[in-house]
């Protein structure tokens, strides 16, 4: 259902003031739809079927926003790579995505990306529109988010410290 909804929303996404780069493979019907959208939206959509690590890193570095609307994601590394490059992740709050992406708070000027809770295309689009609004109309907030994303500590040292604190609490 969600995949079908997303495919139906692609024309709305194409109407947004953005360019879209899609890298990956999946169901044949989705790949075909992406190829059709690319053909009909030259300069607006680029689709690369398959995976190319070098291209992936160029995409991370060139983008402003990295969309990762996963149904299930036990950890996820793509959002971490995107943050290191200064590309803000827009994720569905699941698994490791929820653990690593702190959503933008416009009042406190905090966060390192954008997120949505429910697995539906309308909620995702609403958050996309918000992210685009921040990008175009609240440039200082965007810069803060990029800085926060690039400074997000996802090192093993931080994880080890968290585990040591947890074990210390259990031992007490």
Residue ranges of model-derived segments:
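Conserved small/polar residues in nucleotide/adenosyl-binding loops
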Residues: 1-5
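Active-site-adjacent structural elements in folded domains
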Residues: 6, 50-53, 130-131
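Short acidic-capped amphipathic helix/loop micro-motif used as an active-site/signal-coupling element
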Residues: 7-11
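Nucleotide-activated donor-binding/catalytic signature segment of Leloir-type glycosyltransferases, i.e.
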Residues: 14-58
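Short alpha-helical
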Residues: 28-29, 54, 96, 122, ...
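Catalytic binding pocket for nucleotide-activated donors in carbohydrate/polymer assembly enzymes
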Residues: 58-151
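C-terminal alpha-helical cap of glycosyltransferases
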Residues: 156-172
């Amino acid at each position: 259902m969600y995949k079908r909804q997303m495919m139906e929303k692609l024309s709305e996404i194409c109407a947004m003031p953005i360019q879209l780069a899609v890298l990956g493979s999946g169901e044949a019907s989705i790949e075909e739809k992406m190829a059709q959208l690319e053909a009909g939206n030259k300069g607006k959509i680029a689709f690369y079927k398959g995976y190319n690590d070098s291209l992936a890193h160029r995409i991370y570095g060139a983008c402003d926003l990295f969309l990762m609307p996963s149904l299930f994601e036990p950890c996820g590394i793509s959002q971490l790579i995107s943050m290191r490059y200064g590309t803000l992740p827009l994720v569905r709050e699941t698994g490791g995505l929820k653990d690593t992406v702190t959503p933008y708070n416009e009042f406190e000027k905090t966060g390192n990306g954008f997120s949505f809770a429910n697995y539906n295309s309308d909620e995702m689009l609403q958050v996309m529109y918000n992210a685009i609004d921040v990008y175009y109309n609240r440039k200082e907030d965007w810069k803060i988010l990029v800085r926060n994303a690039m400074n997000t500590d996802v090192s093993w040292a931080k994880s080890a410290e968290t585990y040591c604190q947890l074990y210390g609490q259990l031992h007490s």
